[in-house]
Amino acid sequence: MSIDNIKKLTETLNRVEDNLHEEKGILEFILEHTTDGYWDWDLTSNYQYLSPKLKKQLGYTEDEMENKPESWQSICDKLDLEKTEKRIEDHLDGITEDFKSVMNFTHKDGHIIKILCRGKVVKRDENNQPLRMIGTHTIIL
């Protein structure tokens, strides 16, 4: 490999790094200035990160709600939960392109809150098995 090729490769890598840094800044701005909560689910370990805004939507602090699906499932309306689990399963199986469900939750203070949950599998293994799914929670007024 010549020195010119190394210089061109270095310039390309620097541009890619600059673009990634810019995209990260945009994403951080959006997440900071939106009222939506978000979640990130590692399907292999069943760890589901629940953002502080998502927990706040439901009336909880960061420490009051564990990062696992059971945390939100336990306060979701049972019929909505059944419908939602079916939609998640359909999406994980590749039947649907993405996942959407409207759910009623019992807020920590006791009132009902309606939330639109949207998500998508963003990582699959070599056998097309889902590994990671991410999504958002939007309060419906």
Segments from the language model and where they lie:
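PAS-family sensory modules
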Residues: 1-38, 132-141
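PAS-family sensory domain signal
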Residues: 22-73, 116
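Short N-terminal helix-initiation segments at or just after the protein's N-terminus
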Residues: 13-20, 45-51, 76-83
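PAS-family sensory domains
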Residues: 4, 8-11, 61-133
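Intrinsic disorder/low-complexity signal
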Residues: 16, 35, 39, 76-79, ...
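A sequence-level detector of short linear motifs
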Residues: 49-50, 114, 132, 139
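A short acidic/small-residue loop/turn micro-motif
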Residues: 56, 120-121, 138
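Hydrophobic pocket-lining residues within nucleotide cofactor-binding pockets
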Residues: 43, 122, 140
